[in-house]
Curated annotation (Swiss-Prot):
Chain positions recorded as [4Fe-4S] cluster 1 binding sites: 11, 47, 84
Alphabetical list of SUPFAM superfamilies matching this protein: Radical SAM enzymes
Family label: Belongs to the methylthiotransferase family. RimO subfamily.
Any single GO BP term: tRNA modification
Protein name: Ribosomal protein uS12 methylthiotransferase RimO
TRAM domain boundaries: 398-458
Lineage of source species: Bacteria, Pseudomonadati, Verrucomicrobiota, Opitutia, Opitutales
Gene: rimO
Residues where [4Fe-4S] cluster 2 binds: 166, 170, 173
PANTHER family in alphabetical order: RIBOSOMAL PROTEIN S12 METHYLTHIOTRANSFERASE RIMO, RIBOSOMAL PROTEIN US12 METHYLTHIOTRANSFERASE RIMO
Cofactor note: Binds 2 [4Fe-4S] clusters. One cluster is coordinated with 3 cysteines and an exchangeable S-adenosyl-L-methionine.
Family matches, as CDD domains: Radical_SAM
Length: 471
């Protein structure tokens, strides 16, 4: 039996691709093991969103190659590179990683990984042969509800990819060139998958894609544009999906990630407010507030539009936690642009916020723009905005003290609230005896920046110990 070890890097969307590969390997009778040193084949599922992601991916590839030369039994081990970096740069990497890599596979080969492994073993590669590339053109694959998949997340939460690809023209982003144009799954396919996950005991469904708000629009008879609002009157839309998911029997959260501000509509706001299973949490990357920056980024929004949208979301969905991300150091960004961004962050007080330093990515229009900023300037602006948000986060956390929250227990002593997505947001530290993978009601007793401390109602602090991570 061939033993395969898989290293998954990058975002949750890449993790789903890894889960699909593992599912197909199991179906083909291959063993998937966590220890790379014991595997016959190692697959590195790479990320190439920004330079640091590519560097991390290449670092893992080189580490696997280095280790397989240290032990006699690993010298015949095969190394396969998959994922976004392979899809985008396989031709370039074929020469630079000639000695390290046996094969490159693209995004459309995640369901073909087992026969590809068998083909690699059937070939006799000489030292002068280039690595085999199975990468095809622009990706067109999209998973279905019955696509074999082995979940790599804890049993109580899952990521569900509702679409693939992106139609947005953001000047800083390479993703549309890697993952292709937007293509939605059917509502029936997503509902079938979620229903099965709930049957298996999943308590949190995280909906993901490059742009979840564009779901269904690619099937409309009248073609939408990058600013078309969610509107079920024109055809299948995200609101259609959310209402059908909300109707599934069971006790679970539906969390909406990766929304685009240009597509938000009053219908979407109303739908979230009317669907109790949809978490009072939204992920809406805004990227900037300066009109000049939004125009150069080609974000299809304006500062005025964004301010109005956030106000409408908060008014229409009481108790909503808004998560966003911004980019600082974009070409041409001035001190005045950063001042405006910081003022906006201060006045809006986002419940959750992250900041990226702009990364000059080959193949993007922004990479060729004049007025590229220095790494020192980017770093200073990142520190300024994050320091501001750290204080805001503490102020937001303070408002939770004394409130009762429903949390999902992640591990002994650690939980997440409705306002906390997996991996990217804060934690709620709770007594260790609360059952993992289940919901619990707790009262917040304290906080530390982004994290909360909480107890079951009526329990006194002396009756429990804080989880080690919080000490």
């Amino acid at each position: 039996m061939i033993k395969v070890s898989l290293i998954s890097l990058g975002c949750a969307k890449n993790l789903v691709d890894s889960e699909i590969m593992v599912g197909h390997l199991h179906q083909a009778g291959m063993a998937v093991i966590p220890e790379a040193e014991k595997a016959d084949v190692v697959i590195v599922n790479t990320c190439s969103f920004i330079d640091s992601s590519k560097e991390e991916s290449i670092g893992h590839i080189l580490e696997v190659h280095q280790h397989r030369g240290l032990r006699k039994r690993r010298k015949e081990q095969k190394l396969i590179v998959a994922g976004c970096m392979s899809q985008r740069f396989s031709k370039d990497l074929s020469s630079s990683l000639h000695d390290e890599v046996d094969a490159f596979i693209g995004l459309d080969q995640v369901t073909k990984v087992a026969p590809i492994i068998q083909e690699i073993y059937a070939r006799e590669r000489t030292k002068t042969d280039d690595p085999v590339s199975f990468v095809e053109g622009r990706s067109t694959f999209i998973p279905d509800y019955d696509t074999p998949r082995f979940r790599l997340t804890p049993k109580h939460f899952a990521y569900v990819k509702i679409a693939e690809g992106c139609n947005h023209p953001c000047t800083f982003c390479i993703i549309p060139q890697i993952r292709g144009r937007h293509r939605s799954r059917t509502v029936e396919s997503v509902v079938a998958e979620v229903r099965q996950l709930v049957r298996e005991g999943v308590k949190e469904i995280n909906l993901i894609s490059q742009d979840t708000t564009f779901f269904g629009m690619d099937t409309w008879e009248q073609r939408p544009n990058p600013r078309t609002p969610v509107d079920s009157g024109r055809g299948t839309a995200l609101t259609t999906l959310l209402r059908q998911l909300n109707a599934i029997e069971g006790d679970f959260w539906i969390r909406l990630l990766y929304t685009h501000p240009a597509h938000w509509s009053d219908e979407l706001i109303r739908t979230i407010a009317e669907c109790p299973k949809v978490a009072r949490y939204i992920d809406i990357p805004l990227q900037h507030i300066s009109d000049a920056m939004l125009s150069r980024m080609q974000r299809e929004t304006s500062g005025g539009y964004i301010r109005d949208l956030i106000a409408r979301i908060r008014a229409g969905i009481p108790g909503i936690a808004v998560r966003t991300t911004f980019i600082v150091g974009f070409p041409g960004e001035t001190d005045a642009d950063v001042d405006e961004l910081c003022a906006f962050i201060s006045e809006t007080k986002f419940e959750r916020l992250g900041v990226f330093r702009y990364s000059q990515e080959d193949g993007t229009r922004a990479a060729k723009m004049p007025e590229q900023l220095s790494a020192k300037t980017k770093e200073a602006r990142w520190h300024r905005t994050m320091a501001l948000q750290k204080q805001i986060a503490a102020d937001v956390s303070k408002t939770y003290v004394g409130r009762t929250l429903r949390v999902l227990v992640e591990e002994p002593g650690v939980a997440r609230g409705e306002a906390d997505a997996p991996d990217i947001d804060g934690r709620v530290y709770v007594p260790r005896e609360l059952p993992v993978g289940e919901f619990a009601d707790v009262t917040v007793t304290g906080y530390h920046d982004y994290d909360l401390l909480a107890l079951p109602p009526g329990q006194k602090p002396a009756q429990w110990k804080v989880a080690r991570q919080a000490q």
